Amino acid sequence: MVGRSNLSRRRFERLVRRALAALPEEFRSRLENVAVVIEDEPPEDMPDTLGLYEGIPLTERSLADVTLPDVITIFKGPIERTCHTEEDIEDEVRLTVLHEVGHFFGLEEAQLE
């Protein structure tokens, strides 16, 4: 089944929602103004990207900042292609959501590993 998941979009969305709901309340409450979206594929210049945070991390914001809403995008296609089973997909979705939420809170790549 590697790279050939038949996971429906609805099921994938549930996995993302479940990963977000599993976050501790003190983190979830800070994500109210963060849009979490699911796309089938990442941009062509980032074909293996599983997730993407776009915005200004909380640690870099000031009161004077006027920013667009932050966006976390989870890419269904690359996640499915890297996973062997539906359980693997569920685990990868959870890890990817945590990783991108970590960027929102200002964690760097090395801290997220």
Which positions does each model-derived feature cover?
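Short alpha-helical catalytic segment bearing the HExxH-like zincin motif
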Residues: 92-100
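Active-site rim/adjacent substrate-binding subdomains
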Residues: 1-92, 104, 110-113
